[in-house]
Swiss-Prot record:
Matches recorded under Pfam families: Orai-1
Name of this chain's protein: Calcium release-activated calcium channel protein 1
Gene: orai1
GO MF annotations in UniProt: store-operated calcium channel activity
Organism for this UniProt entry: Xenopus laevis (African clawed frog)
Membership in a protein family: Belongs to the Orai family.
Length: 258
């Protein structure tokens, strides 16, 4: 064992003495190497975080799309129209169009998730840091974001509209009065139920839109802060590189004039 610092002996020098013996260019070189290694590890960690985020988005999109598209198909098949009731033409057209668009949007998101997710899962299960380069999540980033937006934003809004239209189609014929020319129209219990569901769903849809906009702005602000932090780290690396490039330049001594 080596004695403590301050004891006069011929043992190895203390760490403070070693630090004093290191010249300034060597210290700059070591700092640059350390920062480069940290930057490489941080880039790999960032790639792995993007991979896990893409995988989570695809899983959420596939589950949500399968659930909501299945509900829309069952709702269209199982709904029973009253043959003796005169439905408004616009109601049936809106219900059919909303159901079709809802199923198409969610099937598109489900198709993207089904095609990309197995390739990402295969890479994420390999216990190797460099295997992240084999994942297609960087190249398919726009497709993943599009599928996630279709499934969680557009698909959810269409689902809310589907619920409202389904309530009108289902409850409108209930206790509908037969109005003659001498009688005034009255709101039936079925119409009241449909109006109530619409009055509840419209504010909820507005709250959903406000939350989606607020969440998107918060996410963009967080990404912007992270970009500024990475730019500052790159500026520090560039400064250290500049100091390393000029460490061999001769220092000009001041000239004294008589």
């Amino acid at each position: 064992m080596y004695p403590e610092c301050g004891v006069e002996t011929k043992s190895r020098p203390c760490s403070k003495q070693l630090q004093e013996e290191v010249s300034y260019p060597e210290w700059i070189s070591r700092s640059y190497v350390e920062l480069m290694s940290l930057n490489e590890h941080s880039m790999q960690a960032l790639s792995w975080r993007k991979l896990y985020l893409s995988r989570a988005k695809l899983k959420a999109s596939s589950r949500t799309s399968a659930l909501l598209s299945g509900f829309a198909m069952v709702a269209m098949v199982e709904v029973q129209l009253e043959p003796n009731h005169a439905y408004p033409p616009g109601l049936l057209i809106a219900f059919s169009a909303c159901t079709t668009v809802l199923v198409a949007v969610h099937l598109f998101a489900l198709m993207v998730s089904t095609c990309i997710l197995p390739n990402i899962e295969a890479v994420s299960n390999v216990h190797n840091l460099n295997s992240v380069k084999e994942s297609p999540h960087e190249r398919m980033h726009h497709h993943i974001e599009l599928a996630w937006a279709f499934s969680t934003v557009i698909g959810t809004l269409l689902f809310l509209a589907e619920v409202v239209l389904l309530c009108w189609v289902k409850f409108l014929p209930v206790n509908s009065p037969k109005i003659s020319s001498n009688e005034t129209s009255a709101v039936s219990s079925g119409q009241a139920a449909a109006i109530t569901s619409t009055a509840i769903m419209v504010p909820f849809g507005l709250v959903f839109i406000v939350f989606a906009v607020h969440f998107y702005r918060s996410l963009v602000s967080h990404k912007t802060d992270r970009q500024f932090q990475e730019l500052n780290e790159l500026a520090e690396l560039a400064q250290l590189q500049d100091q390393l490039d000029h460490r061999g330049d001769p220092v000009q001594s001041p000239v004294h004039y008589a």
